[in-house]
Amino acid sequence: MLQVASGNREEGQVVELKKTKYLPYLFNLVMPKSFYHSHNRIVVARLYSNVHKHDKQAAEFFEGFQTPCFEVPASMFPGEAPLNKIVFMPPVMLPMGFEAGGVFGPGVLPRRSYPIDLTASGHKGQSPPLFVGLRRLYVQLPSEIESFLDKMGEFPATQDTLVYGMRRSNQLLKEEQAQELMLRNDLSLSMAYNLPAPPTPPSPYPYRHVPVQYNIYTPDLSNVLMMMPHQRKLTVAILSTVNNPHVPSVALATMGDEECPKFELPSDVFPICEGVNRPIFLPRRFLPKGFESGCVFKPGSLSELWFMGYMGRFSPPQPQHNCAITPPLFVGKISRVVLAFDLMKNIQMEYGAAQSSAQSEGSLNAVEPKKPNVPITKGFLVMETEHPTPPSGGYSLQSYQEGSAKGCVVKVEKGETQEMDEAHPTKEESKSEEEGEVQSGSQEEKYLSWFKVDSDIDLIAETMVDMGTAQMSLIDEEALPGVDGACVLNQLREVFEDRNEIRQNIDQLIHDHIYRMNRDRMLALRLPIRSYFRMYDKVDNQ
């Protein structure tokens, strides 16, 4: 029997252990497996005096020691609990996986301040002992404990599945008489049923924590069906903070210009709630189907006596994040314009559609072999060569248009040498005709090859060296607006020319990073590092 909540602890937060009458050895205490993988790190668990006995020798030995502590959340205790009476324990006496924790001895907590659902309804005598602990951020349990928890299964009392249990109506005071809503003609008691939501893709942050706050509570009930045995003008239903969480967009809609239809609540049933406890009316698009207006009472706004008097034995349980306070409540006005529809039939249709889809997905006829998702690598560079066979790492190409279609953006062609022209300037006119013939012949002998973006850069550079003087340019500069073509080509040329130097610099950076990581690891483990670094320096010199 336990409850969990979120929390953290500052490093170095300790307190002195004073003389105590109850200090049990809880190293063998094991929590449910889901708690070790949950984002909630604080747990409140009931202890048993006959099992978790006081260790007198440990209490005398650790008296005066500094023990880790943390701030105990008051929201987990109803009423004004004496949280200052907690006794924080030494780390060696804590359960596995905990960095801090403390205990309330037998009878230390008053019965009215003891967490709800951690004691039996007919419990008599002093309150049982209680353990409050803060789990480490990452816990690695022994394999034996892991196998034991797998065999035992999950415990039902976890943070995500706590069910708020109402006290029975016969537990009211004798002079008070239950006025349950099921006995009235103007109100009906409904049960909120959530339609099955479509599967969502897995989140890259599986342990993302959404903080639970109850300053305002505005859920989205558009996907909720209200199941009622009798149709009345107004209906009341208990909501779930797990299935119907707070939605900030709904809160913004209630504060904006969007219309929120209102109605008057029966004054003989609902108390006058003002301020933060007032009912919040929702916009029509966030109401359940078949309702023209509705409002919600946030968790803790209505007293437990109200639930005991007006809900009583007919109140359907709903999972809650916090059972120390009363659950949220929905009060809705059924639409008279829209014809009432059969909710059970709608539910059956939803289940039938879900089952048929599941059967079709699981049948052999519907299963198709998965095709490998091979991404098509885009092109990068087009090169003019004088050989019909493409160079190593390249592929043949017919035209520049085909290269653009493959994604190529850079073209490389052989540059014209001007050394002969500078040495014999007087022979330019005589050789003009011969150059034209050579150019026409060379155009016929040129072939196109293209390289992918992940091709070997060494093969591309070697091919460019074999060409002699290679000139790079963009195939279609107009297709790249806002790109400085000259700067891009200059950087690409530097990559081709200085690729070996770039690799050496990266290798040196990785080498230095490994050196620092090993040094920090040795320092953290408090191991001798002189011999290690001498050996490391010898390897570097070699």
Swiss-Prot record:
<keyword id="KW-0677">Repeat</keyword>
<comment type="similarity">
    <text>Belongs to the DM7 family.</text>
</comment>
<dbReference type="InterPro" id="IPR006610">
    <property type="entry name" value="DM7"/>
</dbReference>
<feature type="region of interest" description="Disordered">
    <location>
        <begin position="415"/>
        <end position="443"/>
    </location>
</feature>
<feature type="compositionally biased region" description="Basic and acidic residues">
    <location>
        <begin position="415"/>
        <end position="430"/>
    </location>
</feature>
<protein>
    <recommendedName>
        <fullName>DM7 family protein GG17591</fullName>
    </recommendedName>
</protein>
